[in-house]
Design a protein with these regions (language model features):
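Non-catalytic structural scaffold of enzyme domains
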Residues: 1-170
Length: 170
């Protein structure tokens, strides 16, 4: 399931194919099915705390991919992993949770304390941070509220719209 904004989806698709090309060489590219949603609909559901409807949307996407012949489901967005359990229960093929390879890389790098940046949902709720802490015994730090609000704003009002402002990098 693609990133929620097409901006992130395009980036992930490029990285996936560059990785395949680098590994296999030549003209190789990823064999993949991608289901993209209308982020305006997703953002409305998130903002209005309509997570049951958001789960239905993600479950529908996962089932469509499964029917299309996908071998597994990857959800290319941190925030929507709030709905990971619903997605995983809805399909027979494996669902690969984004926090697992993230944690494995963190551990490989010899780290045990990390800072988590993301949307307000990702930073403040337990669905992502809790998995890192409980399953991988990592200490996860999040910014203070004012910083979380700023990061959330930058993600939604800039990055999801394809804007990368120099001032926001600081």
């Amino acid at each position: 399931i693609a990133g929620m904004s097409w901006e992130s989806s395009a980036h992930y698709y490029r990285l996936l194919n560059e990785g395949i090309r680098d590994r296999l060489g030549g003209f190789h590219s990823a064999k993949c099915l991608m289901y993209s949603v209308d982020f305006a609909e997703v953002e409305t559901l998130q903002r209005e705390n309509r997570w049951v409807e958001a789960a239905e949307m993600m479950v529908d996407a996962a089932r469509r991919l499964e029917r299309g012949g996908a071998d597994c489901i990857i959800l290319c967005t941190n925030t929507m992993h709030k709905l990971a359990d619903s997605i995983e229960r809805s399909v027979r093929i494996p669902f690969l949770h984004i926090a697992d390879p993230t944690a494995e890389r963190i551990i490989t790098e010899g780290l045990d304390t990390i800072a988590l940046l993301g949307t307000r949902f990702t930073m403040e709720e337990d669905f992502y941070r809790g998995r890192l802490e409980d399953k991988y015994d990592l200490k996860v730090l999040i910014p203070e509220k004012a910083e979380r609000d700023l990061i959330h704003h930058v993600i939604y009002d800039e990055l999801c719209l394809g804007q990368i402002r120099e001032a926001s990098r600081d």
